[in-house]
């Protein structure tokens, strides 16, 4: 076999049409072997003799796409000094563009002996671990272009590749649970009809099913356990894992883009799947443990601000390079449109504390590729000072956990919530305005993958996570949920009716709030997880979206999950209507914060926003401070939008009155005078059916409208 010197850049395996260049960074190694793996179980070892700036490299003519490979790193094994080299372990390339196979868990994939953790384990891991794969970078993108949907037009839909597609009756069996399933016209049609503009995918980077979960008969369904930051997860491919997963993912992105839907990836750059000092040796740990991980003062142990056993070393230039290379790769080569960063506060930890000016954010800010896509932070981690909502730099948007908590509190009847609710409804200026950000920095959500589904939020007071095998100890215990009078399944019609109303309240509030709304997949069908608020390990019907069939009943695959109340197509229709109402009216998705006064240049004497008690008088400070107050009316002035259109034109819109009754009693609302003479009801969450355009009741200033307990009504006045 010919071995040429090759190049130190780019890192990873790079196929050029005639052969492949291999390059891997390691400061810890004495010697590195590239192992080409053959289908008969044998391997050909090639020593990487060339080294530039601690990058070992070689070029191998004739090595083609589909070739499986790994590295064996020879060097010191001294955990007490943070060194864990072990040439018996076949290691994944940190820059692998595809990964083949899965782990067969056993002592072979660990760097130590189970019965003697201080002793190096020299069992060969190759037959038991995954392999890196050389991929062909060439793909016919045609005329693919990123949709580049502006934030004020964006409606996010958080989804799991398998969970969204596994039970869809319109998908061929072989496409369910796959990237190709995402690209199927039946799935795309649902997203388009719902009004979704961006699909936020839960992790699709190559991840690992934990040893502990596999032993329990479970697996890491959510996927927040990355081992390959450049490789699409191979189990989501419908037709092979020797690079086919890359082509299938690209094809899915191309199809979604053709439909005008952006693809945003949930990425986990805060830790890896190698766990703590008792975790397996799969890649980074054996290549250069000191360079990749944050270690404690006793370097045999790992610092953990993620709750997973380890944290990547964010002050290491090689970790930062890997993350930035990964982000650029997914944008330039895979054509994704943005990222949601899991536990993003960890990315700001150069040292112990969270630093919003850390090197990572500097690198993102100046990067001509990454800085131009959507950047969404999950603005917290489990370390000290990790809750950082409102503290990310101006380029970033954030999952607004305070929005979620406040909206939940309002509709479950918590006292003293109106003032904060007003802030959340109008874009959370208290969090974002001072540093020059706009309402669009707030990603508003009521539910997401982590926690109760929308159905379960109104059906359970307590978590029911027994199926996870941890005696219901896992998952959040403070859910701000309310079961409407009965825990879980019930035949009580009044409870069921109230639950339906509450779900409509949450959807309507979300879609009528300033900021960027995010729907959790299946909530439009009232998907239930039977009270499990931490279904990270439930790769089964509990987590998969149940779709209606053509007749509107339960989807193929049987009845609804045990105890479920069926597929709610009425809620889907309501959700569609609210999404499209939002999309059609710029006053519901302003790019600037409200002023609370008349806007200069609009020739309108009315404020751009006004707040009223149910009696129709403007709110006073005493009203805001009232512990019992749980109802109000909001006036949104469509004639007082301060921001111009894309060509500098003045934007005008219809005006709206949003009436909220979060109390346990019916309340008579007076339509405010002096803010418009004639109005029409366009949304009423007390009614199970979705209103047809123009069919709502007409009312005039001074009229009374009775809102039943825990309901919401929206009035519209033409511009």
Label for each model-derived stretch:
Residues 1-153, 157, 162, 179, ...:
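Carbohydrate-interacting/catalytic domains
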Residues 125, 160-336, 343-366, 386, ...:
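Substrate-binding/active-site clefts of carbohydrate-active enzymes
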